[in-house]
């Protein structure tokens, strides 16, 4: 996803409020844990993209930020929502540097849920874990990991170790954890 961002100068409440009134989202770009720049993202463009995004996939979505003539690859590290309207009011981006490890949550996509044997026998599919914490290089980031639940019967479970994890991605979460189960109703 490509975003055109503008620079902003101050952290004063009045300026940030004005940015939001003009249809912008105040954001901070970090690199190596340190603040690199205060920026503004177009709220309409970001919200439209967010509405098309699969649930949980924002954490593993790589953005290309066009900032002052440069193309910067970044991940959303934090997002803040308005309490009542649920509008995005602030973003934190982390710059991706080639060769430097990045920690992120990659969502798990459960496939063949309709064809699951246990569900056909009257069971209920319960997703225990929705994402897995990993460490990898920016070039190895994938949007999601898949886990096939078609052969899962009643009262059976699949663990994180059953997920085919691509080379270059090292899980931080214990692979002994239960990812999904089919429970009797």
From Swiss-Prot:
Signal peptide: none annotated. Keywords: Ribonucleoprotein, Ribosomal protein, RNA-binding, rRNA-binding. The keyword Disulfide bond does not apply. One of its GO terms (biological process) is translation. Gene3D superfamilies: Ribosomal protein L25, beta domain, Ribosomal Protein L25, Chain P. GO terms for molecular function: 5S rRNA binding; structural constituent of ribosome. This is Large ribosomal subunit protein bL25. It comes from Chlamydia trachomatis serovar A (strain ATCC VR-571B / DSM 19440 / HAR-13). The gene is rplY.
């Amino acid at each position: 996803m490509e975003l055109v961002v503008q620079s902003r100068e101050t952290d004063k409440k009045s300026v940030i409020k004005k940015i939001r009134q003009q249809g912008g989202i105040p954001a901070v770009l970090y690199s190596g844990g340190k603040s690199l720049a205060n920026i503004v993202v177009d709220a309409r463009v970001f919200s439209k993209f967010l509405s098309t995004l699969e649930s949980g996939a924002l954490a593993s979505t790589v953005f290309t930020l066009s900032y002052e003539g440069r193309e910067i690859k970044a991940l959303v590290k934090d997002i803040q929502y308005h309490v009542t309207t649920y509008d995005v009011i602030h973003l934190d981006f982390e710059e991706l540097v080639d060769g430097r490890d990045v920690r992120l949550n990659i969502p798990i996509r459960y496939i063949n849920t309709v064809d699951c044997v246990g569900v056909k026998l009257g069971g209920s599919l319960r997703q225990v874990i929705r994402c897995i914490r990993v460490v990898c290089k920016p070039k190895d980031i994938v949007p999601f990991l898949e886990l096939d639940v078609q052969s899962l019967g009643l009262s059976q479970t699949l663990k994180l170790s059953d997920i085919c994890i691509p080379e270059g991605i090292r899980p931080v979460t214990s692979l002994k954890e239960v990812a999904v189960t089919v429970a009797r109703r």
